[in-house]
Every structure is written in structure tokens, then in C-alpha cells.
């Protein structure tokens, strides 16, 4: 019954799938700016996904909202932590403040157009019948645990307090990325054990074991194909040096980017186009950040040669690399969001592709207008 108690206040706001989608996305965006998307997925998902399910939002639509607002918009902009702008700026010979202050319209056009396109393209399927199975699970859990009022109240109070303590801890100790994810994940495991003890008493070890088994089985069943597909792309990245030697240090994917850079005409608009393409190519390794030194260096080269804005060119490359690999397009970059929403990462990537392409087109047009 703890999830039912937690849902009560939010149910007054989350009345329709459309409103729920925007509220979930904006919440994910704000958390991702301060904590980065990976820990925010676990933090926001653990609290808000049950609310979204109860409001009628499909798991796939919820995953899209969290992924596009978090791993796309917030991570590519990164105005608070400034990890991505710092890498791009260092390679481009400018400051991170230059990118954020001069190219902010490009970031907002990319993020705004992408999430709006995603909403408009999927608004009719946000509350489909696919949700019924998840909704039934929640309802059964509610009805079976309503008798444990004390346990439900204790757990309902412990969950938000524990995750709030995580936020304070991450901000105080400057934890982000994998470290922050570990803090949130560890808290979730402790809460699961605490809830099992309160709800099932002596049977709690068996329940915890079953929950862990179900989680591992789900991960293996859903993400095993991702490992195989990802292996072929990783062979094209820098990791190929461990197999074929140092002579292949750049990797096949980076070779494509370098070749395109060498054959790009000296025109600000063509340079902007290839900056975007090269950023997307470097993002295919599933990292997003690995291509930022290359796109930053090319922004400096192209900007100097064509008298174009280096921050705008660097922002374009950064947007392409992170939206593709950070990620919203590459399936193995979607694993955290797909896992928390119980959806296929490949299906999520397929749904993300049209709005991201629309957003990239809009960002390119905005950049060209700024280069005039």
C-alpha cells in the first residue's frame, strides 16, 4: 500500500496521459541538470513511474519522456554541471561559458523541437491498452498490501526521505555519473529490503531473493541482444586497438569522421552540416562524450577557416554526439531508462528516431541563422 499512499497527492495533478508526460519529462530535465541523467533515471523513475502508470501513461511513452528530456535535452545542454561543454570548449580553445552563452538558442531549439515533436507524433498512443498489464500489477499489489497500514505508512515516508537524502549527499560530495547512480541504486536495494521486512517478516529473505532473481532475469531477457549488436559497433571504436594493434588507433567510426572533416568545403553552412554529421557518427559508440574532443577541435578549425562562430559549431557537434550516443538513438545507451520502465531499448530507440531527426534539422537551421 505504500505506492498507493505515494500516488495520492500526485494523482490530483496527473489526470491525463498528456499532462503526465510533460510533468514527467520536465521533472526529469530539472533533476538531470543537477545530477546528470543516469542517477536521475533511478531517482525519478522509482517515484514517478507508478504515478504515470496510474494516470494511464504507457510505459513506452514514459520512457520517451524521461529519455528525451534527460539523456537528450539536459545532457547535451549541461548548463549546471558543464561536463560536456567543458570537454568541447577545451578542444575548441574557448571557454565553456562561451558555448553556453553564445549557442544557447541552438540547445533550446534542439531540445524544445525534439520533445514537442515526440509529444505530437505519439499523443494518440500515450494511453494505449499496453498499459493494462502494468496497471493490473499495481492494483493487485495495492489490494494485497492494504492490510499492512503501518508498514505502508513507514515505507511511504521512508522512500521520498531516502531519495531526498541521496540528492543532498550527491550535491554535498559532488557525486555524479556512475558514483551517483551507485548511491541511488544502493538506496533502492536497502528500501526493498526494508519494505520486505516490514511487509513479510520472517519471509522477507525469500521475497528479497525472488525480487533480485526477477530483476536479473528481466535484464538478461531484454538486454542480451543489445550486447551482441553493440559488439559490432565497439569494434569500430577505439577498443579495436586491443585486437588489431595500435595501427588502428582511431577506430573505423572515427576514421569516417576524420575523412569527412578532410573533405569538407570551407563554407560556414557546409561546415555546420558536417559538424552535426560528425557528432552523430562519433556518438554511435554509445558514449556521447568520446566524440566531443574531435567535434571541438573541428569547430576551432572550421570556425577559424570560415570566420564562423566557434561556439555555435562546437554546440552542433556536441548536440549530435550526445543525442545519438548519450543517448536517445543508440539502443545500448538507453538501458537505464528502458530497464526502469520495463520496455525494450530497441523499441524505445525506434520511437525516439523521428523526433530526434526533426530536432537535429531544426537545430541545424537555427545554427545557420546564427552564422549569417
Feature map (PLM): residue ranges:
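Alpha-helical transmembrane segments
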Residues: 54-64, 198-208, 308-312, 329-351
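Membrane-embedded alpha-helical segments and adjacent helix-loop junctions characteristic
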Residues: 1-55, 202-302
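Selective recognition of specific alpha-helical transmembrane segments in multi-pass small-molecule
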Residues: 158-169, 220-235, 361-362
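Juxtamembrane and boundary regions of transmembrane helices in multi-pass small-molecule transporters
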Residues: 88, 92-147, 320-372
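Alpha-helical transmembrane segments in multi-pass membrane proteins
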Residues: 20, 24-28, 106, 110, ...
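Alpha-helical transmembrane segments of multi-pass membrane proteins
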Residues: 18-32, 57-74, 99-104, 108, ...
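Long, contiguous bundles of hydrophobic transmembrane helices that form the permeation core
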Residues: 101-214, 372
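Inter-helical loop and helix-membrane interface segments of multi-pass membrane transporters/permeases
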Residues: 84-98, 131-145, 169-178, 245-259
Amino acid at each position: 500500500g505504500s505506492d498507493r499512499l505515494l500516488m495520492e497527492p500526485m494523482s490530483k495533478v496527473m489526470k491525463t496521459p498528456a499532462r503526465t508526460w510533460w510533468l514527467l519529462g520536465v521533472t526529469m530535465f530539472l533533476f538531470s541538470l543537477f545530477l546528470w541523467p543516469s542517477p536521475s533515471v533511478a531517482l525519478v523513475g522509482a517515484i514517478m513511474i507508478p504515478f504515470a502508470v496510474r494516470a494511464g501513461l504507457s510505459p513506452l511513452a514514459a520512457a520517451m519522456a524521461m529519455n528525451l528530456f534527460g539523456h537528450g535535452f539536459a545532457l547535451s545542454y549541461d548548463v549546471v554541471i558543464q561536463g560536456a561543454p567543458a570537454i568541447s570548449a577545451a578542444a575548441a580553445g574557448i571557454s565553456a561559458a562561451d558555448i553556453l552563452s553564445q549557442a544557447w538558442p541552438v540547445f533550446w531549439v534542439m531540445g524544445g523541437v525534439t520533445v514537442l515533436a515526440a509529444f505530437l507524433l505519439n499523443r494518440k498512443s500515450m494511453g494505449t491498452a499496453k498499459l493494462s498489464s502494468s496497471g493490473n500489477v499495481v492494483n493487485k499489489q495495492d489490494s494485497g498490501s492494504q492490510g499492512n497500514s503501518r508498514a505502508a505508512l513507514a515505507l511511504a515516508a521512508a522512500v521520498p526521505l531516502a531519495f531526498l537524502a541521496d540528492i543532498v549527499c550527491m550535491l554535498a560530495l559532488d557525486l555524479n555519473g556512475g558514483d551517483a547512480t551507485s548511491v541511488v541504486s544502493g538506496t533502492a536495494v536497502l528500501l526493498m529490503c526494508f519494505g520486505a521486512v516490514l511487509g513479510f517478516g520472517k519471509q522477507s529473505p525469500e521475497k528479497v531473493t525472488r525480487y533480485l532473481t526477477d530483476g536479473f532475469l528481466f535484464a538478461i531477457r531484454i538486454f542480451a541482444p543489445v550486447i551482441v549488436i553493440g559488439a559490432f559497433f565497439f569494434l569500430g571504436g577505439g577498443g579495436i586497438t586491443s585486437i588489431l594493434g595500435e595501427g588502428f588507433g582511431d577506430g573505423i567510426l572515427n576514421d569516417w569522421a576524420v575523412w569527412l572533416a578532410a573533405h569538407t568545403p570551407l563554407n560556414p553552412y557546409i561546415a555546420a552540416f558536417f559538424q552535426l554529421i560528425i557528432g552523430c557518427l562519433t556518438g554511435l559508440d554509445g558514449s556521447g562524450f568520446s566524440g566531443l574532443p574531435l567535434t571541438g577541435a573541428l569547430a576551432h578549425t572550421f570556425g577559424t577557416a570560415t570566420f564562423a562562430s566557434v561556439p555555435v559549431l562546437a554546440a552542433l557537434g556536441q548536440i549530435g554526439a550526445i543525442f545519438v550516443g548519450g543517448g536517445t538513438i543508440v539502443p545500448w545507451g538507453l538501458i537505464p531508462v528502458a530497464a526502469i520502465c520495463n520496455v525494450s531499448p530497441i523499441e524505445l530507440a525506434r520511437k525516439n528516431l523521428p523526433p530526434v531527426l526533426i530536432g537535429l534539422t531544426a537545430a541545424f537551421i537555427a545554427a545557420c541563422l546564427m552564422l549569417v
